[in-house]
Amino acid sequence: MRVLVLHGPNLNLLGRRETGIYGNETLADIDARLQELASELGVDLECFQSNSEAALIERLHGAPGTVDAVVFNPAGFTHYSIALRDAVAAVGLPVVEVHLTNIHAREEFRHRSVIAPVAAGQISGFGTAGYLLGLRAAVELVSRGKMSRA
């Protein structure tokens, strides 16, 4: 089984940016923890980060036939990127949306995700552990043959 982890904009600044909100772990730390869990689960993992909406869309478009599921933190694009929403809907793979913080407990403009309605599920508010939960969820969805929304 192969899983793609997509990290959206500004996540490359984790560990330096708003540490009171996002914590001290870096993106490299998160990727290392994900790789460790993936090894335990027998999963081949690819991690990709971009600040570019177009690059994230291109990687999603390339996912079918190369991966079985996607764990995706769309970050700031969560709330308004119809293009990413449409890409998630188009790929025909289980996509688990993850967020470090509880987007529903933050500023009102962060409460709405345009990605969630086309994702298999959403995990938010558990910090970096949310990525690990997202990977476990993706593996479970693939194992059960779930392609998209329940």
From Swiss-Prot:
Keywords, ordered alphabetically: Amino-acid biosynthesis, Aromatic amino acid biosynthesis, Lyase
Gene designation: aroQ
Superkingdom field: Bacteria
Family statement: Belongs to the type-II 3-dehydroquinase family.
Record-marked site positions (Transition state stabilizer): R17
One term of GO molecular function: 3-dehydroquinate dehydratase activity
Residues that bind substrate: N73, H79, D86, L100, T101, R110
Natural source organism: Desulforudis audaxviator (strain MP104C)
Record EC number: 4.2.1.10
Active site: Y22 (proton acceptor), H99 (proton donor)
This protein's pathway: Metabolic intermediate biosynthesis; chorismate biosynthesis; chorismate from D-erythrose 4-phosphate and phosphoenolpyruvate: step 3/7
PANTHER family with a match to the protein in the record: CATABOLIC 3-DEHYDROQUINASE
Pfam families: DHquinase_II (PF01220)
GO biological process, one term: quinate catabolic process
Enzyme type, top EC level: lyase
Recorded catalytic activity of this chain's protein: 3-dehydroquinate = 3-dehydroshikimate + H2O
Subunit (UniProt): Homododecamer.
Chain's role: Catalyzes a trans-dehydration via an enolate intermediate.
Keyword Amino-acid biosynthesis: yes
Protein name per UniProt: 3-dehydroquinate dehydratase
